[in-house]
Amino acid sequence: MKTILLLFVFLLIGSSLNAQVEYSSNSQFLKSAPIFSIDAASYKSSKEGKTRVDFFIQVPYANIQFVKKGNEFLASYNITLTFYAEDKSRIIFESIWKEKLSAESFEETNSTDNFNISYKFFDLTPGKYNLKCTVEDSDSRKSTSREFPLNIREIVDSLDLSDLLLVTDVIKDSLGESIVPNVARMVTNKTTELSVYLEIYSNKNQLAYIDFTMKDIKNGKNFNQLSPQELKKGINKVIHTF
């Protein structure tokens, strides 16, 4: 006999996230430093006592300084993720890497449709941290930093959910499905669909009903959708579209 369970997922629309860097409409400001967006989501780790945290950093081409070399335009920038203790008394660890970009035309470098998404994951001990993300343009040496608290929870085997990740596109090919995260969390009045990715962890095969609730904080309206899921033992990947 299958066990029927009720899971609850809540999504706020219209609010700014702690981990989100907001854009300025001042074009001079945009060119002064590499403005970026960052998002993070927690998942069950394969390592005992750890939680895997995925980080996505999105940098628009228009916010990085490109240099023409030959027939192409090149740019690069450094990303630094610094993990502090909750009280910022010490650095737990730091990760630094370089991203390289290329464009075929000057128009590409200034297009607001072009951006680069960096992806890194770390297996971390559950707890409260403070995270500082710094993006530095390699050519101009100008940088932008963003700090925010990071609360990493323990994810259990019996029945649990990962964090929600807002996605802009789901790509299907011969290798399966892949997602494009909506790192900037851009939702406009032209958005007709809203998709989220999450993982459900179960220690047995069972039927679960997921209650998705989306709240528009501007008008106070709630949108509810009940989604039945035939869970298999282990990791169950779910893409839900409102």
Language-model region placement:
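Sec-dependent N-terminal signal peptides
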Residues: T3-S15
